[in-house]
């Protein structure tokens, strides 16, 4: 990553600003401070309402340079880069632990919306960066511990689809976990008991229907608000989120650059707004409070997490099908 940025500096000059536009994205916050340390003359701007878990530490303790780190002001015109970028902030949305805040940026020259985790598009094929090391794809493409690890296009797609289901649902309805005794017995008979292959341990038991589940999640590559955001975060502040969407759709962007999955995505403000339609479909029968264009069974684990966050008793497995 640093090498690629250094290559860009040759053509465009040194890095002037490092921006952390989220408060909850650990995969972003963890690297932002050390990244900023590598660019000694850059100014660092972070989203408001920053916090760390389990102990709320000062930003400087997380690697952010104390004298160069600033909070993004409410008015984008107060920033030194306003002539190039506008931005809009959502939050704080109160969660059970700490508040959620995210900032979306608009780059005027390229008419690009820079969206951290807000929306994304799921490809059929694994992204190039994932395919650089296909081992995890082969690992998850198997149906049992006895299956060989085979690298071919079909298995890469199969493994990618299952990893995507893991990522967004944690445990989709079509995934069961073997009992511990079966996991150990199957590991003994595995043809590959190497450390890299987790000593033959393979707890997953995929049921028929996982391909349909992936297709319904992917929605032909349309813009998608991740299920976790739909059901655990944005549903807790729908009015604030929709006001944020209104602000963003005033920008005349023609592509979206998210931090995950496919990028850039050809998309218009209307496409972006459509991804948030679920917030305009309240459903008192749904544990999230809204209708979602996703299988209810796949959302059941997120429903259990929601109950835990709210301090109530998790649903039993028998109740899963009723929690959509």
Feature locations, PLM:
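Conserved beta-strand hairpin/beta-sheet module of binuclear metal-dependent hydrolase folds
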Residues: 1-7, 103-107, 112-117
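Short, charged/polar "capping" segments at the starts of alpha-helices
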Residues: 1-3, 26-31, 51-55
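Cap/insert and terminal regions of metallo-dependent hydrolase folds
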Residues: 7-17, 23, 30-38, 123, ...
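Short, surface-exposed beta-edge/turn micro-motifs
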Residues: 15, 100-102, 110-111, 253
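Short internal beta-strands
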Residues: 16-23, 42-52
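A structural signal for short, well-ordered beta-strand segments and their strand-loop junctions
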Residues: 19, 44-47, 113-118, 255-259
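Metallo-beta-lactamase
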Residues: 47-103
